[in-house]
Curated annotation (Swiss-Prot):
InterPro entries: MetI-like, MetI-like_sf. The complex is composed of two ATP-binding proteins (PotG), two transmembrane proteins (PotH and PotI) and a solute-binding protein (PotF). One of its GO terms (biological process) is putrescine transport. This is Putrescine transport system permease protein PotH. It comes from Escherichia coli (strain K12). Residues 1-31, 125-133, 205-239, 305-317 are cytoplasmic. The keyword tRNA processing does not apply. Residues 52-104, 154-184, 260-284 are periplasmic. The chain crosses the membrane at residues 32-51, 105-124, 134-153, 185-204, 240-259, 285-304. Residues 99-305 form the ABC transmembrane type-1 domain. It is a multi-pass membrane protein. Transport is feedback inhibited by intracellular polyamines.
C-alpha cells in the first residue's frame, strides 16, 4: 500500500537574505548613490587629510620621519601645529620657480596637445565607419604599453646618437647631432606624446555629437569654411576641448617621470621637488606642504571646469 507524501512546501527565505532584500527595497537607491562618495572619501579625502596632517608636523629622525600633532602626557593633551613648513615655501625661491615652471610646462603642453589632438579627432570622427574603430584603437594602443617603457623609448630616439639625429644626419639636414635629450624641449615632447590621447577622445566624442545641419546652414548662408569652423564647430565642441585640456593640464603639472628621465637640471618641476623632499631629504612635512599647495592650485581649473559643465547643462535643458 503506497503512502502519500505531503506536498513539498517552499522554505521561507533565510534571515540574512530576507534582511538584504528588504534593505535593497528600502535603501537600494541611496546605497548606489553612496558608493561613489565612499570611493572618493577613502581614496581622495582621507589621503588628503593625512598629507595635510603631516604638513603641520615637524621633521624628526624617526620612522615615520615626523612628529605627532597630538600627544597625551601627564594627563594633558598637547597639540603642536607647525606652520613653518608653509612659510619655508615662501622663503626659498626654488619652490616658487618649480610651481611656475610646472604651470608653464603644463599650459604649453596642453596647447600643443590641442593643436595636434583636434585634427586627429577630426580625422577619426570624419573617417568611414569601417575604419573609425581601427583609428581609435591606434590612438589608444600606445597606452597599453608601460608608461615607463615608452619614456625610455623616447630617450633612445632623442639622444645624440639616437634615431632622430641619425635620420637627420642621413638626410643631410644637420651636420652634427642636435642636443635634445635632457632639455626642456624633450620634456615638452614627452608630455605631448604621453597625453595626446587624453585630448583626442573627448574632442572626438564632441565631434560625433554635432548636428551637422547647422554647419550646412552656415555654408548655405554664405559663411566660408574657415569662419564656419570657428563660429559653429568650435563652440559646439567647446565642452570636449575643455575636458581634454583638464585631462592633460592637471596630471602634467605634477609630472615626475618625464622631467626626471628626459629633462635636464633646468627642468625644475614640482614633481621632482616632491621626490627630492620625500625620498632624498626625507623631509615629509615640507614635502606634504608642497603637495598641499599644488593641490590648491589645481582646484582653480577644476572649479572652473565644474562651473562650465553646470552652465552647459543649464543651457541644454
Amino acid at each position: 500500500m503506497s503512502t502519500l507524501e505531503p506536498a513539498a512546501q517552499s522554505k521561507p527565505p533565510g534571515g540574512f537574505k530576507l534582511w538584504l532584500s528588504q534593505l535593497q527595497m528600502k535603501h537600494g537607491r541611496k546605497l548606489v548613490i553612496a558608493l561613489p562618495y565612499i570611493w572618493l572619501i577613502l581614496l581622495f579625502l582621507l589621503p588628503f587629510l593625512i598629507v595635510f596632517k603631516i604638513s603641520l608636523a615637524e621633521m624628526a629622525r624617526a620612522i615615520p620621519p615626523y612628529t605627532e600633532l597630538m600627544e597625551w602626557a601627564d594627563g594633558q593633551l598637547s597639540i603642536t601645529l607647525n606652520l613653518g613648513n608653509f612659510l619655508q615655501l615662501t622663503d626659498d625661491p626654488l619652490y616658487f620657480d618649480a610651481y611656475l615652471q610646472s604651470l608653464q610646462v603644463a599650459a604649453i603642453s596642453t596647447f600643443c596637445c590641442l593643436l595636434i589632438g583636434y585634427p586627429l579627432a577630426w580625422a577619426v570622427a570624419h573617417s568611414k565607419p569601417s575604419t573609425r574603430n581601427i583609428l581609435l584603437l591606434l590612438v589608444i594602443l600606445p597606452s597599453w604599453t608601460s608608461f615607463l617603457i615608452r619614456v625610455y623609448a623616447w630617450m633612445g630616439i632623442l639622444k645624440n646618437n639616437g634615431v632622430l639625429n641619425n635620420f637627420l644626419l642621413w638626410l643631410g639636414v644637420i651636420d652634427q647631432p642636435l642636443t635634445i635629450l635632457h632639455t626642456n624641449l624633450a620634456v615638452y615632447i614627452g608630455i605631448v606624446y604621453a597625453y595626446v590621447p587624453f585630448m583626442v577622445l573627448p574632442i572626438y566624442t564632441a565631434l560625433i555629437r554635432i548636428d551637422y545641419s547647422l554647419v550646412e546652414a552656415a555654408l548655405d548662408l554664405g559663411a566660408r569654411p574657415l569662419k564656419t569652423f570657428f563660429t559653429v564647430i568650435v563652440p559646439l565642441t567647446k565642452g570636449g576641448i575643455i575636458a581634454g585640456s583638464m585631462l592633460v593640464f592637471i596630471p602634467a603639472v605634477g609630472e615626475f617621470v618625464i622631467p626626471e628621465l628626459l629633462g635636464g637640471p633646468d627642468s625644475i618641476m614640482i614633481g621632482r621637488v616632491l621626490w627630492q623632499e620625500f625620498f632624498n631629504n626625507r623631509d615629509w612635512p615640507v614635502a606634504s606642504a608642497v603637495a598641499i599647495i599644488m593641490l590648491l592650485l589645481l582646484i582653480v581649473p577644476i572649479m572652473w571646469f565644474h562651473k562650465h559643465q553646470q552652465k552647459s547643462v543649464g543651457e541644454h535643458g
